[in-house]
Amino acid sequence: MKVGIYPGSFDPVTFGHLDIIERSAKIVDELVVGVLNNSAKNSLFSLEERVSMIKEMTAHIPNVRVGCFEGLLVDYMKKINATIIIRGLRAVTDFEYELQIAQANGVQNPEIETVFLTSSLNYSYLSSTIVKEFASYGGDISKFVPEQFIDRIYAKYNITR
């Protein structure tokens, strides 16, 4: 059984993330969306909120489950028996960074393969940072995130629509 992991902070989760998740789920038997708990980082959403939002958004995909981890990805992968890392690429700058990380992970565990998926054209510009920037000013984020998350995101900035 091929178990893959799509790791990230997903703060907040976007249509770009969903695009990668849906496409990744077609190439592995089981896909774990691994939500990183980085206590050194100030997240907009708590770990529990991020996990909950991803579960909501991926409920229609039977071979996807959501987990969370802190520390090294390669250590978490051993725990869940995953051998494939899925990474989404938006631009050349993403590739340069992700290639270095993939090589470092391969040194840690040579059985790990990293698969790069280019983002769909509709989402090649999209990031959680962009969502937060627009939301913080009350901008329209309906093209960036699922409808059911919009009010939750605005609420973090004390904004109502």
Curated annotation (Swiss-Prot):
Its EC number is 2.7.7.3. Keywords: ATP-binding, Coenzyme A biosynthesis, Cytoplasm, Magnesium, Nucleotide-binding, Nucleotidyltransferase, Transferase. GO terms for molecular function: ATP binding; pantetheine-phosphate adenylyltransferase activity. The keyword Nucleotide-binding applies. The keyword Magnesium applies. Its cofactor is Mg(2+). ATP binds at residues 9-10, 17, 88-90, 98, 123-129. InterPro entries: Cyt_trans-like, PPAT, Rossmann-like_a/b/a_fold. It is an enzyme of class 2 (transferase). It catalyses: (R)-4'-phosphopantetheine + ATP + H(+) = 3'-dephospho-CoA + diphosphate. Homohexamer. Belongs to the bacterial CoaD family. Reversibly transfers an adenylyl group from ATP to 4'-phosphopantetheine, yielding dephospho-CoA (dPCoA) and pyrophosphate. This is Phosphopantetheine adenylyltransferase. It comes from Agathobacter rectalis (strain ATCC 33656 / DSM 3377 / JCM 17463 / KCTC 5835 / VPI 0990) (Eubacterium rectale).
